[in-house]
């Protein structure tokens, strides 16, 4: 009997120990994602506390959400629990839940957090949201949460974005390079890439959600875009039902307005927006000189000085519509349509006077006045459709996409001359070239793109992606010149006109690999592109030709998460730029006979290699991003100006042998860029934000004929924002820049400042803003210098940047489902942007 009790006692003890051991080893996993209820963006660094319901004072687990608002953690035990999520300035989220024995996962799915709306007496609960996020290959700036977005253009907001600089002339650089591409909602926008300054200057920032700087594009992106990619994500999300926002602005420079709306019905969601702005440009003034250096003086040389002014006005409009339809939980179709563009009109006059280089006190060689009036338009119209297929395996995805884009542009100008009597008779033939003329130009680029992308996880640590693309791109340009006869009638000048087509067939394929092990993540990629270029001349000089390009483009990046709030990133990529229609157009522009310009249709694609290292640390108090970058190119496309007799310019009619400046584009040789960028945001108090975006760039450029230049340029943008009681906000911004370096000279230095105040009403549905910039001085001066063998050319420009006005926006309705977009879509970023500088044709 005693033996039986002993055995039974041992069995009870063993079973108790086993039960206790099983209880101790029992654990489950909690996961989910925390999003801002209005913007649908991840809420970073929110604090999560999990306790037993019967012991709320003792925390079982404490954790924080990551940069995307995601959280995942193991929790011991079973029974009843309480999870509390808190974030500064937010209403806490409290979730009760139970876990039974054997349950391994509690998935909370998507949780939405809202701003705290309670007031304790006269004390408001406020906080500064982080405006910058960093990933292994990109940095994101949250425009929507920046109060300055209510009164600024997108171009002004770009000055705040890390790794982006915008100088006083509104020239944009990404990673220290002016060669970059612009996307909208993950899709390339060629109009923005070709005319970023004009388009972004006209876009209201309150229509933008955030701006991404993709510093190390992976293999799925086209190989083009030396500096990187700017992805502008427009406002397009909210809460279930419908929403619409209306805005208007008026200033001393013009007026504008816009509307945005989203509606959801069943599985169909549609959003649309439209903006229009009219801009009146105050009169600006220009002056300059074009002098021959002593060693280059000949009997055909002259020094030229000029002085002029110009006034104009223009408009810009943009609109887009997106729709998505969920066929089922695994299949999604999206469609999109977009339009961007505008027009400008201007008129002005310039006085020229030429003197002998060796005797500036002698009588002028000649003098004349040129009167110009012009109008132009530029648009980009695109449409696309995407089909996305998900699978039961998480993150496995197949996407098919088609996109069509057309970019029509027109220019129409008249130039009339008045030649003063008393000119030197040796220059009579030269002055006879000054015939009143009418130039009528049309350019267009139409492209069709077909693309397939596939991505799949391999186990828990690996990701594989592959894809293929075909682009059919047709560039066409028609530049017609009409010269006035003695009666004033304009006759078509076929010899000075140019019609040509530039056809591209681009076939590409890529393969990418990703690895993520605990705190370490890395990506490797390889892309192959084959390009067939076919150039045909319909009117004007030039021989038809065909060129083939083969490019193998590698990329690699590695990131290490030092802590939950800081990371280190290292990357390498190779990028290429195919010349665009502006730099290719062979149209010979001799409106100013002393400065003749044209494009170069035989340019090769430009190839650049870049290495970058960056460190980021983002906390509720401090945001810091520091990066260093080095890039080099051995066949950079640059604008080159030379002094030469006009008889050496091929295709120029009625040359006289006089010395003139000839400007074109060429693959010049070597460029080397080294840069250091820093971004700091300090939330000094829950109501005060102080920030600075700065960069230092060293440039080395080397071309043919001994051309070489190097030097440093510095850029800094800083400011402060103060939140006052009752939803008042005030912002002050200042920026400055030293002269930037060019192959044959340098640009100008700048100083700029602005102030804005805004107030929200009606539960933040109504926002009023007042703004002013450069209010102490109406006109700003800038200058640039171009030097070459035998000449120095200086340009001075006086223009108004003074601006003040008011804006208003009002939001109605609510919406819970944003327009769903496929995770992969078409991205064409392979054309080097041109500009409205010296070159043929123009876009």
Where are these regions (language model features)?
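Surface-exposed extracellular loop regions of Gram-negative outer-membrane beta-barrel proteins
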Residues: 228-246, 284, 305, 315-322, 532-534, 564-609, 630-657, 773-789, ...
């Amino acid at each position: 009997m005693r033996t039986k009790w002993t055995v039974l006692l041992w069995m009870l003890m063993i079973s108790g120990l086993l039960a206790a051991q099983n209880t101790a080893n029992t654990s489950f996993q909690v996961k989910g994602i925390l999003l801002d209820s209005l913007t649908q963006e991840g809420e970073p660094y929110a604090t999560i506390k999990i306790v037993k319901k019967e012991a709320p004072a003792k925390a079982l687990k404490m954790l924080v959400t990551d940069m995307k608002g995601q959280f995942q953690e193991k929790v011991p035990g079973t029974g009843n629990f309480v999870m509390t999520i808190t974030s500064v300035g937010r209403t806490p989220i409290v979730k009760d839940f139970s876990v039974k024995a054997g349950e391994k996962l509690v998935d909370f799915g998507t949780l939405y957090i809202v701003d705290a709306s309670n007031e304790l007496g006269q004390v408001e609960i406020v906080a500064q949201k982080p405006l910058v996020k960093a990933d292994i290959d990109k940095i994101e700036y949250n425009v929507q949460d920046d109060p300055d977005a209510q009164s600024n253009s997108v171009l002004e907001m770009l000055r705040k974005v890390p790794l982006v600089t915008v100088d006083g002339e509104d020239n944009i650089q990404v990673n220290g390079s002016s060669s970059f591409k612009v996307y909208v909602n993950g899709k390339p926008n060629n109009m923005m890439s070709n005319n970023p300054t004009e388009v972004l200057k006209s876009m209201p920032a309150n229509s933008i959600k955030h701006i991404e700087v993709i510093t190390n594009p992976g293999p799925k992106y086209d190989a083009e875009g030396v500096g990187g990619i700017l992805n502008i994500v427009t406002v397009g999300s909210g809460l279930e039902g419908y929403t619409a926002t209306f805005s208007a602005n008026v200033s001393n420079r013009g007026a504008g307005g816009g509307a945005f709306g989203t509606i959801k019905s069943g599985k169909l969601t549609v959003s649309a927006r439209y903006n229009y702005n009219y801009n009146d440009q105050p009169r600006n003034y220009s002056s300059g000189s074009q002098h021959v250096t002593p060693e280059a003086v000949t009997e055909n040389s002259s020094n030229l000085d000029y002085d002029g002014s110009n006034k104009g006005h223009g408009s810009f409009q943009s609109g887009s519509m997106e729709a998505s339809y969920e066929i089922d939980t695994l299949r999604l179709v999206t469609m999109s349509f977009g339009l961007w563009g505008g027009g400008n009109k201007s008129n002005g006059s310039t006085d020229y006077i030429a003197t002998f280089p060796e005797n500036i006190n002698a009588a002028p060689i000649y003098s004349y006045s040129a009167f110009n009036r012009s109008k132009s338009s530029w648009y980009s119209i695109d449409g696309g459709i995407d089909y996305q297929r998900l699978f039961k395996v998480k993150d496995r995805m197949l996407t098919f996409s088609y996109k069509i884009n057309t970019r029509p542009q027109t220019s129409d100008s008249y130039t009339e001359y008045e030649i003063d009597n008393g000119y030197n008779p040796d220059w009579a033939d030269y002055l006879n070239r000054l015939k009143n003329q009418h130039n009528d130009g049309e350019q267009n680029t139409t492209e069709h793109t077909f693309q397939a992308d596939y991505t799949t996880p391999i186990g828990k640590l690996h990701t594989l992606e592959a894809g293929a693309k075909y682009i059919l791109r047709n560039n066409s340009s028609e530049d017609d010149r009409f010269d006035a006869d003695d009666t004033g009638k304009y006759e078509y000048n076929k010899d000075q006109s140019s019609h040509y087509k530039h056809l591209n067939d681009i076939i590409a394929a890529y393969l990418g690999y990703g690895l993520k092990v605990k705190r370490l993540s890395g990506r490797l990629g390889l892309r192959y592109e084959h390009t067939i270029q076919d150039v045909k001349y319909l009117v004007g000089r030039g021989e038809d030709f065909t060129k083939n390009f083969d490019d193998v483009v590698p990329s690699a990046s590695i990131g290490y998460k030092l802590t939950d709030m800081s990371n280190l990133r290292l990357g390498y990529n190779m990028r290429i730029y195919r010349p665009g229609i502006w730099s290719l157009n062979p149209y010979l522009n001799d409106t100013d006979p002393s400065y003749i310009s044209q494009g170069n249709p035989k340019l090769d694609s430009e190839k650049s290699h870049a290495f970058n290292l960056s460190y980021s640390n983002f906390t509720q108090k401090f945001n810091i991003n520091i990066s260093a970058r080095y890039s080099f190119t051995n066949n950079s496309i640059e604008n080159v100006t030379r002094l030469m007799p006009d008889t050496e310019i091929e295709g120029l009619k009625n040359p006289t042998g006089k010395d003139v400046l000839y400007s074109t584009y060429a693959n010049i040789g070597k460029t080397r860029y080294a840069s250091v960028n820093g971004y700091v945001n300090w939330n000094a108090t829950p109501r005060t934000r102080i920030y600075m975006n700065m960069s230092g760039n060293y440039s080395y450029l080397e071309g043919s004929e001994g051309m070489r230049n190097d030097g440093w340029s510095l850029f800094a943008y800083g400011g402060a924002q103060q939140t006052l009681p009752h939803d008042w906000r005030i912002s002050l911004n200042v920026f400055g820049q030293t002269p930037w370096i060019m192959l044959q000279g340098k640009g100008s230095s700048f100083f700029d400042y602005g102030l804005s105040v805004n107030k929200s009403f009606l539960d933040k549905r109504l926002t009023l803003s007042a703004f002013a910039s450069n209010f102490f001085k109406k006109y700003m001066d800038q200058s640039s210098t171009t030097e070459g063998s035998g000449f120095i050319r200086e340009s001075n420009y006086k223009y108004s940047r003074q601006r003040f006005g008011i804006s208003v926006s009002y939001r109605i309705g609510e919406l819970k489902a944003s327009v769903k977009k496929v995770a992969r879509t078409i991205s064409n970023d392979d054309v080097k942007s041109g500009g409205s500088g010296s070159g043929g044709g123009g876009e």
